[in-house]
C-alpha cells in the first residue's frame, strides 16, 4: 500500500476514498499510537461544516473509544482552534475532520500531537503500520475500560477569548466585511470581530453542509472584492473552509494575498523589535516582489519548499516568529502552532487601526511582479526530466538570461498529480506567457 498520509493528513472523496471504515481505523490506530501507555487518554475532535463530517466523526470517535480513550467533541470549529484547544484542555492529541479549501465532496482527517503540532512522518507511518497489520497487539478493552465521549460546550468561547488576546487593541470605529466561506469560521470570526467593537457585515456565513468553499472564501474572493467597495468598508477578510488561512481586501477592492500580509506584518513586527533575527520564513512560490519589499525593509527571508508544514519546521528549528504562504496560510508562532486565519485577520486589522493608515497604503510597501503558471503533463517517473535533459536546461538558462535579475524561473514537480509546474516572474506579462507555455510544451514533449 502507498503512503496513506499526504502533506495535510489523510484526504479523499468522502464515502469513496475516505470511508467510515477508514475513519474508524484511523481513530483506533491514532488513539493507540498517540497515547501510548497513558492512563485513560483524552483526544479532542473538531470538524468543519461539510455534510460528511457527521458520518466521519461518528466513525472516528467509535475508533477512539474502542481503545479505551476519551473523545472530547468540540463540534464545528476552525482547524487552528483544535490545535489551540488541544493544548488548553491538556489533551493527549487532537483530530480535525476537514478538507480545508477543497470542494465539498472531499474530506480529511488530520492529527495534532499534545502540543498542537501536526504529526511527524514517523508517527503517521506508525499509525499506518498498525492499520496494515490489522491491529495486531492493539487491545480491545471491556467493561469500565471502554472510552467515553464528552461534548465540550465552551470550546468556541475559549477559542474566541484566545484570539482576542492576540491583539492589544479593540476595533471600534472600523467597518469590516467578512467572507466565512460557509465554513468553520461562520460563528467564531463574526463573534470575535463584534465583541471587539467593529461594525461587521458578513457574506457566506450560512453553511448548509454543501456550500462550503463554493464560489466563496479565500479561494474565490471576487464577491468580497466587490462587496467591500459597495458597502464602503475599511477592509474585507476572506477565510477558507477550515479557517486556517485568510486573505484580505483593501478599501479599494484590491486583493491583499499572503505575500502582502507577510510584508505588512513583517515590517510592523520589525519596527516594534518583535521579529526574531529580523527573519520571515516564506516558500519558493512567494512573489519576487515580497523578497524585494522585505529586503528594502532590512528583513531577511528564509525559503522553504511549498507547504505550511515545511514553513513551520524551519520556524521551529531557528525560533523564527513569522512565516507563511501566498495562499494566506500565515503562522504567528508566538500565538499558535499552525496557520490561523482569525489571528491573521485580527493582526491585519490591529495594524490598520494602530498605524492610522488605510490597508492600501500599508500594502504599497510591496509591488507584485506579474507571475505566470503553466502545467506540463508528465508521467510520474519522468518528473525530473527538467534536471536531466540538456535542451530543457539550455532553454531555462536562456529565459533566465532574458529576465536578468528582474524575474525568475521556478520548476516544481507536483506532489499529487502527474504534472510539472512551470512558474515565471518578471515585468512583461505577455512575454512571460509566451515563455512559460513554450517551456511547459518543451518539457511535455521531451517527457512523453
Curated annotation (Swiss-Prot):
Catalytic residues identified in the record: 100
EC number from the UniProt entry: 5.4.2.10
Residues reported to bind Mg(2+): 100, 240, 242, 244
Protein keywords: Isomerase, Magnesium, Metal-binding, Phosphoprotein
Cofactor note: Binds 1 Mg(2+) ion per subunit.
Required cofactor(s): Mg(2+)
CDD domains: GlmM
Gene3D superfamilies, A to Z: Alpha-D-Glucose-1,6-Bisphosphate, subunit A, domain 3, Alpha-D-phosphohexomutase, C-terminal domain
Catalytic reaction annotation: alpha-D-glucosamine 1-phosphate = D-glucosamine 6-phosphate
First-tier enzyme category under EC: isomerase
Pfam families membership: PGM_PMM_I, PGM_PMM_II, PGM_PMM_III, PGM_PMM_IV
One Gene Ontology MF term: phosphomannomutase activity
Cellular component, GO, one term: cytosol
Function: Catalyzes the conversion of glucosamine-6-phosphate to glucosamine-1-phosphate.
NCBIfam families hit by this protein: glmM, PRK10887.1
Family: Belongs to the phosphohexose mutase family.
Annotated protein name in UniProt: Phosphoglucosamine mutase
Organism classification: Bacteria, Bacillati, Bacillota, Clostridia, Eubacteriales
Amino acid at each position: 500500500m502507498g503512503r496513506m498520509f499526504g502533506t495535510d493528513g489523510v484526504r479523499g472523496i468522502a464515502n469513496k476514498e475516505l470511508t467510515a471504515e477508514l475513519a474508524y481505523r484511523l481513530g483506533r490506530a491514532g488513539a493507540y499510537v498517540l497515547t501510548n501507555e497513558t492512563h485513560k487518554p483524552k483526544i479532542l475532535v473538531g470538524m468543519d461544516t461539510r455534510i460528511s463530517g457527521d458520518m466521519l466523526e461518528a466513525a472516528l470517535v467509535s475508533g477512539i473509544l474502542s481503545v479505551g480513550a476519551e473523545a472530547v467533541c468540540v463540534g464545528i470549529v476552525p482547524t487552528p482552534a483544535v490545535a489551540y484547544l488541544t493544548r488548553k484542555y491538556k489533551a493527549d492529541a487532537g483530530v480535525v475532520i476537514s478538507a480545508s479549501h477543497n470542494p465539498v465532496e472531499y474530506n480529511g482527517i488530520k492529527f495534532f500531537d499534545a502540543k498542537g503540532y501536526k504529526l511527524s512522518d514517523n508517527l503517521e507511518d506508525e499509525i499506518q503500520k498498525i492499520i496494515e497489520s490489522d491491529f495486531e497487539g492493539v487491545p480491545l478493552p471491556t467493561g469500565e475500560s471502554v472510552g467515553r465521549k464528552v461534548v465540550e460546550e465552551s470550546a468556541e468561547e475559549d477559542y474566541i477569548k484566545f484570539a482576542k488576546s492576540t491583539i492589544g487593541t479593540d476595533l471600534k470605529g472600523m467597518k469590516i466585511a467578512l467572507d466565512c466561506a460557509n465554513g468553520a469560521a461562520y460563528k467564531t470570526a463574526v463573534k470575535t470581530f463584534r465583541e471587539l467593537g467593529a461594525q461587521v457585515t458578513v457574506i457566506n456565513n450560512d453553511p448548509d453542509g454543501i456550500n462550503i468553499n463554493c464560489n466563496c472564501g479565500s479561494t474565490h474572493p471576487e464577491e468580497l472584492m466587490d462587496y467591500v467597495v459597495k458597502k464602503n468598508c475599511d477592509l474585507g477578510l476572506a477565510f477558507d473552509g477550515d479557517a486556517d488561512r485568510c486573505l484580505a481586501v483593501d478599501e479599494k477592492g484590491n486583493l491583499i494575498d499572503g505575500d502582502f500580509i507577510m510584508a505588512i506584518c513583517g515590517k510592523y513586527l520589525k519596527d516594534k523589535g518583535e521579529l526574531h533575527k529580523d527573519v520571515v520564513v516564506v516558500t519558493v512560490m512567494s512573489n519576487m516582489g515580497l523578497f524585494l519589499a522585505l529586503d528594502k525593509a532590512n528583513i531577511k527571508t528564509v525559503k522553504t519548499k511549498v507547504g505550511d508544514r515545511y514553513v513551520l519546521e524551519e520556524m521551529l528549528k531557528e525560533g523564527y516568529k513569522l512565516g507563511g504562504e501566498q495562499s494566506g496560510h500565515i503562522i504567528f508562532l508566538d500565538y499558535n502552532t499552525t496557520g490561523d486565519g482569525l489571528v491573521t485577520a485580527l493582526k491585519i486589522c490591529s495594524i490598520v487601526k494602530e498605524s492610522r493608515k488605510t490597508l492600501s497604503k500599508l500594502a504599497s510597501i510591496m509591488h507584485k511582479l506579474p507571475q505566470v503558471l503553466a502545467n506540463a503533463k508528465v508521467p510520474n517517473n519522468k518528473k525530473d526530466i527538467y534536471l536531466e535533459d540538456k535542451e530543457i536546461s539550455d532553454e531555462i538558462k536562456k529565459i533566465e538570461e532574458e529576465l536578468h535579475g528582474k524575474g525568475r524561473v521556478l520548476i516544481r514537480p507536483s506532489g499529487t498529480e502527474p504534472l510539472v509546474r512551470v512558474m515565471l516572474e518578471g515585468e512583461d506579462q505577455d512575454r512571460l506567457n509566451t515563455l512559460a507555455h513554450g517551456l511547459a510544451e518543451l518539457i511535455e514533449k521531451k517527457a512523453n
